[in-house]
């Protein structure tokens, strides 16, 4: 059923909550099987998802979004495939403590237009690995790409044994529905990736939230730097996926002793220099 209003959203939350309660009882072996299948499916779809993201959002570069999708699927799988996320993690006889891995419950996943597929893949996979359910609120300008990525992960997870409603999404996202999802009493955690307003809303929701928003990443270049390498690295990073990644360099601070040399190097590589006010 498509989710286009508050009533339909509430029904979706109920379904995903029910699925998560079932999933919370899965063993580590079952979870790892689902995690692997979902990651492989996302990796296999990295190229068509990248094309879909660029076409729908009008932002970024297909080849670079392929890399991001690959990173969000294969790298994340390899990084966490051996991580224990079920049952007893450790016991300390000295202090009489036992550390147990438990799912947090239902997660609200806010996805931006700049990374509509890779962010959805990443959040869906880590939710599956930790036995949580997740509902995505995609950006309106990239909703189809985001929801397609979520559906690919979901279908692979179901085929591997996951409950059928363990991942959900809003089909026609609006600010109202996004806020409704964040403030829903059954949501236990918010993973918010987006602009400053969205991240602030997540932190102001009264729920535990992890937010990632626009940054102002500076680069400091001093006399010890390899100027050729520094300039090439900054330009490569800043132009990756048309510079839409919030962690890419936003400003360069250069000490006086090498300022002219760095400036000339940027200019020789096609960099634009603003002068005056």
Where are these regions (language model features)?
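Predominant activation on well-ordered alpha-helical scaffold segments within soluble catalytic domains
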Residues: 10, 17, 36, 50, ...
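Short, flexible active-site loop motifs that bind/organize anionic cofactors or intermediates
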Residues: 21, 39, 168-171, 220, ...
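Rossmann-like NAD(P) dinucleotide-binding subdomain of oxidoreductase/dehydrogenase enzymes
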Residues: 88-229
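Aldehyde/semialdehyde dehydrogenase
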Residues: 25-43, 47, 51-52, 176-189, ...
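ALDH superfamily catalytic-core signature
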Residues: 3, 199-277
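N-terminal Rossmann-like NAD(P)+-binding subdomain of aldehyde/semialdehyde dehydrogenases
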Residues: 1-98, 126
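Short secondary-structure boundary/hinge segments and terminal tails
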Residues: 71-72, 145, 220, 252
